[in-house]
C-alpha cells in the first residue's frame, strides 16, 4: 500500500518537470507585480485600482479571492469524508453569491463613490453615518484586522500543507515560500496586480476543477464510478443522509456571509461602472457553479480512487493533490499544483490588501490627518505596503503550528465577517433609519456572539445538537435585532441620508 508522502515524493523526485511548472507560475506572478507597480501612484490606485476594473476581471477575481484553497482542498476533503451531504454548503454559497450581485453590488458601487469616494468598508460606514468621532470606523477596522489575520493564516496553512504533501518538503518551508510570493506581488503591485493575478488564477482553478474529476472517472469506471461509490456506502450519494435539520441549515447558511465579506465586496467597489455588473454576475456565478460542482466531483470520485490505487490517504484535504500527481504527467501535475497555489494565493493577496487598506485608511490616516493624506500620497502608499508585510508576518506566526482543518479555519473567519458586517451593509444600503449607535451596537454584538459561540457554546453540541449550529446564524440574527432596536431608540440621522439613498436608487436604476 502506498502512503501519500512516499508515493508522491518518489514521483516528484523522478520528474523535475513539476518543479519547472511551479517555478514558471511563480515567475509569471512576480512579473505581473512589476508590470503593474507603476499603476500605484496614489492610495486609491494602490487599494482600489482607481475604480477602473472591467466586468470579466471583476467576476473571476471575486470568485478566486472568495473560493481560496477551500474549494480545491477543503471541500473535496469534506465530500470525501462525509459524502454528497457536504454539498449543502455549495448550494448556500452559490445562492448567497447570486443574491449578493443583485442586492449589494450595484448600490455599494454607487454609494461608496457618492459617500466621499470611500475606498474601504469602514470608510463607507463612517461617511454613510456621518461618524465624526470615527468610532464606527475604528471598530469596523479592528474587526477587519482581527478576522482577516485569522482568515489569512488559513491560507498559509493550505500552502504549507501543499508543499508538505506534494513534495515531501517541510511544512514551514512551504509556508514561507507561499508567503514570500504573495507578499511580493501584493506589496509591489497593489490592487490592480492582485486583480489581474486573480483573474489569471481563476482561469487555472476552473480548468483544474473540470479536468481532475473527468480524468479520474476515465481511469476508474466512467459514469459507473458513482455507482461504485454508492455501492461502497449507500449514504455517499444521499444529499440528506447523515445530516440533521440543524446540520443542513448550518451548511446552507454560509450564504449569509457574502454580504459582509470585505475582500469580495471590494471587487464591486472597484468595477468601472455599476452597469457592468450584470456581465460580471453571469460570468462569476457560472465560474462558481462549475468550480464547486467540480470540487464535489473530486471528492466523490476520490472515494473510489483511493482504494483503487491502494493509497493511504492520511489527510482528506490533500485528496486533490494526490489525484493530480497520480493521474497526470508531471508537467500537467505541476499545472494542477499551480491551480492549488492559485486558489490559496488569490485569497491571501486579497485579504492582505483589504487589511492593509484598513490599517492605512482607517487608522494611519486618523493619526496623520486628512490633509496630509491628500498632499503626500507616496507616504500613504508606502504605509499600505508595510501594512501588507506586518499582517503577513503575524498570520505566518499563527500558522506556524496548525491545529485545525482548513474548512474550520475559514468557517470561523467567514462567520465573523458575516455576523458583523452583513446586516450592517444591508441596513446601510437600504434603510434610512440606521443610526451610528445602531451600527456600532449591531456590529459588535454580531462579532461577540460568533466568538462566544465558537469558544463556549459549540463545545456543548454533544448535549444538544442546537449548540452545534453554525455560529453565523445566531450572530447574524442578534446583529439584525440589535441594529434595528438601537437605531429605533437613538437619534435619527439627518435628511441627507434619505436624499443620498434616493440618489443611489435612481442611479442604479439607470440602464
UniProtKB/Swiss-Prot annotation:
Determine if Transport is one of this entry's keywords.
yes
| Annotated GO CC locations | plasma membrane
Catalyses which reaction(s): L-proline(in) + Na(+)(in) = L-proline(out) + Na(+)(out)
A single GO molecular function, which one? L-proline transmembrane transporter activity
What Pfam families does the entry give? Answer: SSF
Which residue windows are transmembrane per the record? 16-36, 53-73, 84-104, 138-158, 173-193, 199-219, 239-259, 285-305, 326-346, 380-400, 409-429, 437-457, 466-486
How does the protein associate with the membrane? Multi-pass membrane protein
Q: Name one GO biological process term.
A: proline transport
Where it sits in the cell: the answer is:
Cell membrane
Q: Which Gene3D superfamilies match?
A: Sodium/glucose cotransporter (1.20.1730.10)
Where does this protein chiefly localize?
A: membrane
Q: Which PANTHER family does this UniProt record tie to the protein?
A: SODIUM/PROLINE SYMPORTER-RELATED, SODIUM_PROLINE SYMPORTER
Which protein family is it in? Belongs to the sodium:solute symporter (SSF) (TC 2.A.21) family.
Q: What is the purpose of this protein?
A: Catalyzes the sodium-dependent uptake of extracellular L-proline. Since most S.aureus strains are L-proline auxotrophs, this transporter may aid the bacterial persistence during an infection of tissues with low proline concentrations.
Q: What is this protein called?
A: Sodium/proline symporter
Q: Give the originating organism.
A: Staphylococcus aureus
What lineage, starting at the top, does this entry show?
Answer: Bacteria, Bacillati, Bacillota, Bacilli, Bacillales
Amino acid at each position: 500500500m502506498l502512503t501519500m508522502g512516499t508515493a508522491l515524493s518518489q514521483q516528484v523526485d523522478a520528474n523535475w518537470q513539476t518543479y519547472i511548472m511551479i517555478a514558471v507560475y511563480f515567475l509569471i506572478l512576480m512579473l505581473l507585480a512589476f508590470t503593474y507597480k507603476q499603476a500605484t501612484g496614489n492610495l486609491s490606485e494602490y487599494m482600489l485600482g482607481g475604480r477602473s476594473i472591467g466586468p470579466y476581471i471583476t467576476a473571476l477575481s471575486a470568485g478566486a479571492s472568495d473560493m481560496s484553497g477551500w474549494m480545491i482542498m477543503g471541500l473535496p476533503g469534506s465530500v470525501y469524508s462525509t459524502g454528497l451531504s457536504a454539498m449543502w454548503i455549495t448550494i448556500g454559497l452559490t445562492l448567497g453569491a447570486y443574491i449578493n450581485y443583485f442586492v449589494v453590488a450595484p448600490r455599494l458601487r454607487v454609494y461608496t463613490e457618492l459617500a466621499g469616494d470611500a475606498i474601504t468598508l469602514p470608510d463607507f460606514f463612517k461617511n454613510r453615518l456621518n461618524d465624526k468621532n470615527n468610532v464606527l470606523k475604528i471598530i469596523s477596522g479592528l474587526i477587519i484586522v482581527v478576522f482577516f489575520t485569522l482568515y489569512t493564516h488559513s491560507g498559509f496553512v493550505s500552502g504549507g500543507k501543499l508543499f508538505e504533501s506534494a513534495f515531501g518538503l517541510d511544512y514551514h518551508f512551504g509556508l514561507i515560500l507561499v508567503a514570500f510570493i504573495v507578499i511580493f506581488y501584493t506589496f509591489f503591485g497593489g490592487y490592480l496586480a492582485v486583480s489581474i493575478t486573480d483573474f489569471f488564477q481563476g482561469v487555472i482553478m476552473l480548468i483544474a476543477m473540470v479536468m481532475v474529476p473527468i480524468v479520474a472517472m476515465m481511469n476508474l469506471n466512467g459514469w459507473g464510478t458513482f455507482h461504485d461509490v454508492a455501492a461502497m456506502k449507500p449514504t455517499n450519494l444521499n444529499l440528506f443522509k447523515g445530516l440533521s435539520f440543524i446540520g443542513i441549515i448550518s451548511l446552507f447558511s454560509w450564504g449569509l456571509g457574502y454580504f459582509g465579506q470585505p475582500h469580495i465586496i471590494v471587487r464591486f467597489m472597484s468595477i468601472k461602472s455599476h452597469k457592468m455588473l450584470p456581465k460580471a454576475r453571469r460570468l462569476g456565478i457560472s465560474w462558481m457553479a462549475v468550480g464547486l460542482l467540480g470540487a464535489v466531483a473530486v471528492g466523490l470520485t476520490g472515494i473510489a480512487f483511493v482504494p483503487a490505487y491502494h493509497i493511504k490517504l492520511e489527510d482528506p484535504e490533500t485528496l486533490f493533490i494526490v489525484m493530480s500527481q497520480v493521474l497526470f504527467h508531471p508537467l500537467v501535475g505541476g499545472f494542477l499544483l499551480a491551480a492549488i497555489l492559485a486558489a490559496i494565493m488569490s485569497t491571501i493577496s486579497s485579504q492582505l490588501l483589504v487589511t492593509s487598506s484598513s490599517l492605512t485608511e482607517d487608522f494611519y490616516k486618523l493619526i496623520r490627518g486628512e490633509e496630509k493624506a491628500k498632499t503626500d500620497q507616496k507616504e500613504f502608499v508606502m504605509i499600505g505596503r508595510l501594512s501588507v508585510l506586518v499582517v503577513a508576518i503575524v498570520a505566518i506566526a499563527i500558522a506556524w503550528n496548525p491545529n485545525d482543518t482548513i474548512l474550520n479555519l475559514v468557517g470561523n473567519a467567514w462567520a465573523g465577517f458575516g455576523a458583523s458586517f452583513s446586516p450592517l451593509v444591508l441596513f446601510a444600503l437600504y434603510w434610512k433609519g440606521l443610526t451610528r449607535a445602531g451600527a456600532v451596537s449591531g456590529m459588535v454584538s454580531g462579532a461577540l456572539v460568533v466568538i462566544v459561540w465558537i469558544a463556549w457554546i459549540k463545545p456543548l453540541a454533544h448535549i444538544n445538537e442546537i449548540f452545534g449550529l453554525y455560529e453565523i446564524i445566531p450572530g447574524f440574527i442578534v446583529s439584525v435585532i440589535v441594529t434595528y432596536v438601537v437605531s429605533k431608540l437613538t437619534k435619527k440621522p439627518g435628511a441627507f441620508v434619505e436624499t443620498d439613498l434616493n440618489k443611489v436608487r435612481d442611479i442604479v436604476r439607470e440602464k
